[in-house]
């Protein structure tokens, strides 16, 4: 049986992971809003288009980096989760899959 301190530590970790997921999704939404605004170029010339493409490429790289970081954080802590935790019948693998699904759904919108 787990000690109260261990349970608190595990709950704290889960809340941190969920907060990180929410922050990442919010960050991705901000990038998407920025991308949508930047695509509308009036009177385009080659220099303006190249600058906007560069900005879009940079935003896309940030988005990919945020997703990779989130996956890394979740997978690094998978052993800790599988040793200690089951949330309403969910295994650690299922929790991580849910996090990845959230990212995929967000990516589609």
Swiss-Prot record:
Subunit structure and binding partners: Homotetramer.
PTM (free text): Phosphorylated by host.
GO BP annotation list: proton transmembrane transport
Virion surface membrane side: 1-4
InterPro entries: Flu_B_M2
Membrane topology of the entry: Single-pass type III membrane protein
Top-level division of the source organism's lineage: Viruses
GO cellular component: host cell plasma membrane; membrane; virion membrane
Further comment: Influenza B virus genome RNA segment 7 encodes the M1 (AC P06816) and BM2 proteins. Normal translation produces the M1 protein. The M1 termination codon overlaps the BM2 initiation codon in an overlapping stop-start pentanucleotide 5'-UAAUG-3'. Termination of M1 translation triggers reinitiation on the BM2 AUG in the +2 open reading frame.
MF GO annotations: channel activity
Transmembrane regions listed in the UniProt entry: 5-27
The organism of origin for this protein: Influenza B virus (strain B/Singapore/222/1979)
Function: Forms presumably a highly low-pH gated proton-selective channel. Trp-23 may function as a minimalistic gate that opens and closes the pore. When the environmental pH is lower than a threshold, the BM2 channel would be activated and selectively transport protons across the membrane from the extracellular side to the cytoplasmic side. Crucial for the uncoating process.
Protein name: Matrix protein 2
Site (Seems to be involved in pH gating): 23
Record-marked site positions (Essential for channel activity, possibly by being protonated during channel activation, and by forming the channel gate and the selective filter): 19
Intravirion side: 28-109
Keyword terms, alphabetized: Coiled coil, Host cell membrane, Host membrane, Hydrogen ion transport, Ion channel, Ion transport, Membrane, Phosphoprotein, Signal-anchor, Transmembrane, Transmembrane helix, Transport, Viral ion channel, Virion
Subcellular location: Virion membrane; Host cell membrane
Main location as per UniProt: virion
């Amino acid at each position: 049986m787990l000690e109260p301190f261990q349970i608190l530590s595990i709950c704290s970790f889960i809340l941190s992971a969920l907060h990180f997921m929410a922050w990442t999704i919010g960050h991705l939404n901000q990038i998407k809003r920025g991308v949508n605004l930047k695509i509308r170029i009036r009177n385009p010339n080659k220099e303006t288009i190249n600058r906007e493409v560069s900005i879009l490429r940079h935003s896309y790289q940030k988005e990919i980096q945020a997703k990779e970081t989130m996956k890394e954080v979740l997978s690094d802590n998978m052993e800790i989760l599988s040793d200690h935790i089951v949330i309403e019948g969910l295994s650690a693998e299922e929790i991580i899959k849910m996090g990845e699904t959230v990212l995929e759904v967000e990516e589609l919108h």
